[in-house]
Structure formats: structure tokens, C-alpha cells
Amino acid sequence: MVVLRPKITLTSVRGRIQVTAEDGERVGPWGGTECFLSRQTGQGPCLVVRSSRHKRHQGTFFRLEGVRQVLSLYAMEGKLTVVVPHQKRLCSVFIETFADVDALQMMAATLQDRSRWKDIEKNVACRVQRITRTNVVDTKRITNMDGGTDTHLDYKQFEWGGGEDDSCAVGGVSCNPLEGARGERNGDGVESILQERPTGLPSAHSGGKLPKHMGGDELNPQLEGSTTPGRMQWTTDQIVATRLVCTGSNVFITGSAGTGKTEWLLHLVRNVLPRDDRTVVTASTGMSARLLGGCTIHSFAGIGRGEGGFNRVYNRVKSKPEVVRAWRQCQTLIIDEIGNISPDTFSMIDEIARSLRGAPEKPFGGIQVILLGDFLQLPPVDSPKARNEWTNGNDTDTDSNPIPGKLKWCFETATWESLKLALVGFRKSYRQMNDPDFALCLEDIRFGRYTRRVERILNECSTRQIKERHGIEPTLIVARRDEATEYNAERLKMLEDVHFHRYESEDYAAIPGMNLEKEVSLQQLLELRIGAQVVLLASLPDAPHLSNGDQGVVVSFAEQTRGPALPVVCFATSGGEEVLVPRVSMEVLGPEGRVIATRTQIPLQLSWAITVHRAQGMTLPLVSVRLNKCFFDCGQAYVALSRVRSREDLMLTAFDPSAIFADARAVAFYEKNFPAQRQSVEDTECELVPIKGKTRAKHPRSQGEKNSVDEGGNAPEEHPLRTDAAFTAYHDLDSQVSTDMPLVPQPPRKKRMLVEELPQVTSSAIPNFTQESNNGDANSQLQHPFSQNNLMVDDD
């Protein structure tokens, strides 16, 4: 078993420390994995940063006498930035920790109060402090050199990679991606893990089992956006997924809404994988990236909006040394919400990784890739501009619809095939665990099946009138943004209180021309009145139990000694608790974590109505849905209906069964690769109900298979995929699927795609390290290299 490396200095803060110069250059040798305060002889008070390459008396000494600014807004979340000069350069020292948050807050308080600098301990960097690994494992009470004791120093709790020799143990298996069993990806190693029935979730804490102070085999994650109630028991699927990651395998994690994918990923990032530049956490949306503490995949890859074709994009990426350095240091790449990434973008990122890392024959240049998402939820959305830029005149018909052969999903690409992913599906529903019949109903809807169970439950919801709770009305989920905006404006005018409060945001952008509307979810202008129904867009420092997606009603406004009055909101999710909502700041980070923009604003938004794209990932207390043809794309009905915990919280004001449909190729992918998720055909509740005026394909066929004979008069040859047993069972289940595109994906190309052959990437790029934002007009890439469009476009 590998034991975690102890602190070099007992009073230090362990974490990820990055140093960035004023011109944006990252100074790697000045960063490290732990820092502390010390009054050094001849230098005065200093912030000392160390890494594994330093000896006990060495480090980078930032003299505090010239400190310019201490940004401690997110100190409670383990983040602190200190702006201080060093060697004639103005530097930003960014400190991030999950293990020593309390110590970081104490450090922030000391840095902000110069009167306390005289109390900083002297010459800490010169003191000899010997702690053996045996001491770390066997005791939590360690005697220091002054004869006193330091208690509750559990150095096993978190692993921070500080050098090439850092690694963590999970069930006795190395969790260093490059040291893992790469050769087992397609062999008996992965197969044996998939067939095992493990009993505990491996972690870096104790080589296979969570420590008792974290709940043993259970986890109580107080996470922003958490969908799981109370304490969470890890399932066999989640344990298998963790073990696969720790063997170095490429893994795809999927599952229905509310099956704990986010909670599992947060545990993986915080407690299992190395926490340094070797592990990169990304997501396709800004909201998901912010929740995970990472950046968007477009920001990390450096592709921006991807305009101009591969050659131009690749040349821009090569011109950014921080992006090239990040690609070459990366050993494990996590991409959340993979279903929202277009296949063109996915292939382009793969080709960039191969080229920058000098490994053209290895997928993603040899990086371990961990993908999460659900292809049966919202599909990728390409803007018209991106679609026109990609097409050459042969990819669209006269109605601007994609031709049948056009790829739609990442799993249809040659890149997906080359990764040889181990597939794991999470099956246990935490969100609807108290209403299992409703969970089965949602699973039918997810696959586009209008069954007797779906008909019965949705008919109940269509006749139900839900009363408000703590003043909260059911949130109307719509498909288009303009519909939500219009509805919210009408409801705001209907309030009796004529007095309103307007809040304008305070914006900062390091890059001229940056449009923050596309980067953060905070609104530039917010108008509130007493009685307004709102949704929280960010966690609050004084109310950590509240998180993004919590709803409430504005009940009053509290006057402040400085600045405008702040809204007081009664939140339904906290039992009617009234909370003062202050201004918060959202930061936009570049590929290496450097802050390039901020917006400070009240983190609220009117929520009588929200779009289905905004609702994705949320758990809402009450929901109202007009289930009709306004839901125009596959997966939209499923996402809207699955936001609640039980059928009692759902009300349908319109009900058209034809709005329930799934993408044929996505359904075929899941039926082929996850046959265990099929329901028993003997269950009468699974019988399909005919829909008047709607044609369902019992055997979803591609466009080329619609005719029974070909031009030569011969019957079309059956595709090999249809001979699979799992797919045969899918025929029997039937499904209401969208057959506008071929069911069977194109076979992967054997030849690796050349740079000249790779098509242009779509402009469906994402805001980085922010909450999901609305989409607006695109700025020039030359003006703003980090600005991206939002992939999840929810307007016409």
C-alpha cells in the first residue's frame, strides 16, 4: 500500500499553488504543493511556497511587505489569491486546497491584517521537522520540536501530487495514469473488473476503503448541485468504475438523470486521482465545469470557438505556450457532459492532442480519457453559422436538415472507437429513489417508449393541480429562451408591489472585447420585486447548505450602510428559511487557471419559467410542463420531466404523447452496449400504447433501408449490428424513435485522420469555468481567445 507523503512543514497548507506573472506567463518553478507563512531573518514576513523538489530549508519566498492584494472571497471553498511582487515581477499566487481549508482561512485572515504579521512564527523554513511515514500512518497526535503537540493532522485524508514519484493507492493498484495497467485496457484485467462484485469503494485515503471520519463505506457529500438525498451508499457500478480508472483504462460513465454521476466524479477528483497538472477536469458546459472545479474542454484544448478549420485552429493552439504546456503535462483528462459535444469537436480535440504530444498513433496522444454523460438527454446543438462553416454544399438538403450520413454523436466517430473505452452504466436512481414506479416511467421516456406505465402516470400528472409550497409555484420548463423570458416578464408585472430594485453587475475583463454574457450565468441587469420567484445561481458564503438551483421568493429588501439594499429570499428547499443574498463574484479562468474576467452581481434569476437546457442537472421542488410539440428535439421531454423527485411534484398543463421520442442511433447504442438496462418484455406495463397520428418504427432503419429492395431489385443486406442478441431484444421492445438519421453508425475509419483531412470544428464552444450562461452574438476569436459560445443553445 502506498502511503501519502507527509507535510514538510506542519503548519503549511497543502494543495495546488500556481504562480502567474503580470503578463500572464505561468512561472512553474515558483509554484508548488504546500505553502506557509514565516518571518525569515533578513527578509521579514514571507509567504513560502514549496514543492517536492525543495529541501526542508528551501522554497520560493514571497516578501509580504510589498503585497498588493489578497483575494479571499472563496477562502471558504479552499481558494486564495495573493498579488505580490517577486524578483521585479508582479505575481499572482493562486492557492487551492481541499485538505487544509481551515488553515487557508487563517492564512487569509493573517495576510489581510498587517497588525498580525508580528505574530507570524520565525524562520519556519529553517526549522528541522522530521516526520516519518510511520508517524503519519499510526498516529494523529504528533509531537513537534517545541515539545507541544499538533492534533488532528490526518495526512492520509488527501493526496496531492507534488512530483514525478507521487502516486496514490486504490485497492493496491497505482492510480498514476501512466503507471497504471495500460496493457489491461483490452485484456483480462478490464474484463475481470467488470465482472467483479466489489464490496467497498476504493479511495486514496486507505487503499480501498473510506476512513471512518468520512462515513466508512458511505459518503455524505455536501455538494453544490447534489441530487442525492442524505447519505450515499456507493453501488457496485460506481466501485467498478473507480477500479477501472485506477488501472489506467479509458472509461465511459453513463446513466439516467439522478444516478449519482456527479457525486461519483467529485469523489474521484477529490480523493482518488492526483491533484496536480497531471489530472485535468473539464466539462462541455460552464455550469458543470464550475461545479467540478475545472474548466471547459474548449478552454483547456485552446480551440476557442474553433472557427476557420483545423489548420487555423491548430496554429492558434500552438501559439499559446500555456495551452501546449498543459497538454503535455496532462496524463488523465476528464470530460463531463460528453453528450453535448459534437463529433467534429471531439475528433478535433483528439487530433490536437496527438499532434501536440508527439504521439500521432495514440488516441489523445496517450492520455487516459474519462468520459461522463448521457446520450439520451439533450443532443449537441450547432449554431447555423457553425453548420454553414462546416458544410461544403453536400452535407445538407434544401431544408437545411442534416443528411442521413452526417454524424451526430461522439460514439459514432473513429476517435471513440480508437479509445477502446470500458463502458459502465450507473443504474440506481437516487433522485427518484422514493418513487420507483416513477423512475421506471422516466426510463421508458428516456428511451422514447410510450408505454402503459408512461400513459398512466402522465395522465395522473395532467389532472393534478399542485399548490405552492412556501410561496413557490411550480417552475414552468419550456424549450425556448424567448418563451421563458416573456413569461417571467409578464409574471413580474403582475406583482402587487410596484417598487422594484435594479442591480447592475460590476465587470472586469483582462481581454478587450470580452462578452461576459456568454461566460457567466450572472445577469448584467437584474430587476426584483417583493414576491418575485427566483432561483439561486451560486452558493452563498453564509449559507453553504444552499446551492445552485435552489428556489425561493423575495420577501423583503435589507438596507445596507453602503450600497443598495439586498434581497431577502425565503428558500423552499431549506424549509422556508429566509436568507440575505449578497453579491458574489464569478471568475472566468484561462486554460491554466489564470483569472481573465470577473463579474460581481446578485446570484439570482427570475424562475417562474426556465429553459430545459438551463434545467438540465437541476433538481427542482415543483415543476410544470407543457408537454406538446414545443419540445422539438429528442431528449427534451425526458430532461424536463426528470427534474423532480416524485410524480407528486410534477404537473402537466398540456399532454401530447408525440413529444416523447429519442434519437434512434442513441437508443441503438445503449441497447447494444447496456443490455442489462432493458426492462422485461413480460411486464404488461411495458407494453407500447399506439399514438394517434404518430408512426413508430418497430425496426428503426436508416434512410437507405426504407425501401424493401434496392435499385437492382435485391433485398437490402442486413447490417451486422442487427444480428446482435441485444439488438434483437430491442426490436421486440419497440420504441418511439426519431428516424430522421440512420440508426447504424458508419464503421470507423482505419486510417488515422490527417491534419489536412480533418474538417473545421463547429462553433459550439463553451464558457470556461463558469456556470452555464445564455448564448449571444459571438465575438472575434482574435479579440478574445478565451471567449466561447454556449453549446447548449436554447433558442431558435
From Swiss-Prot:
Location in the cell: Nucleus
One Pfam short name: PIF1
Record's keyword annotation contains DNA damage: yes
Reactions it catalyzes: Couples ATP hydrolysis with the unwinding of duplex DNA at the replication fork by translocating in the 5'-3' direction. This creates two antiparallel DNA single strands (ssDNA). The leading ssDNA polymer is the template for DNA polymerase III holoenzyme which synthesizes a continuous strand; ATP + H2O = ADP + phosphate + H(+)
One annotated GO biological process: telomere maintenance
Residue ranges of DNA binding: 636-655
Necessary cofactors: Mg(2+)
Gene3D superfamilies: P-loop containing nucleotide triphosphate hydrolases
EC number: 5.6.2.3
Major localisation: nucleus
Keywords in alphabetical order: ATP-binding, DNA damage, DNA recombination, DNA repair, DNA-binding, Helicase, Hydrolase, Isomerase, Nucleotide-binding, Nucleus
Region listing for Disordered, in residue ranges: 197-230, 692-719, 762-796
GO CC annotations on file: cytoplasm; mitochondrion; nuclear lumen; nucleus
Annotated binding of ATP, by residue: G255, S256, A257, G258, T259, G260, K261, T262
Molecular functions per Gene Ontology: 5'-3' DNA helicase activity; ATP binding; ATP hydrolysis activity; DNA binding; magnesium ion binding
Subunit structure: Monomer.
PANTHER family referenced in this protein's UniProt entry, alphabetically: ATP-DEPENDENT DNA HELICASE, ATP-DEPENDENT DNA HELICASE PIF1
Family: Belongs to the helicase family. PIF1 subfamily.
Purpose of the protein: DNA-dependent ATPase and 5'-3' DNA helicase required for the maintenance of genome stability.
Protein name: ATP-dependent DNA helicase PIF6
Species for this entry: Trypanosoma brucei brucei (strain 927/4 GUTat10.1)
Lineage: Eukaryota, Discoba, Euglenozoa, Kinetoplastea, Metakinetoplastina
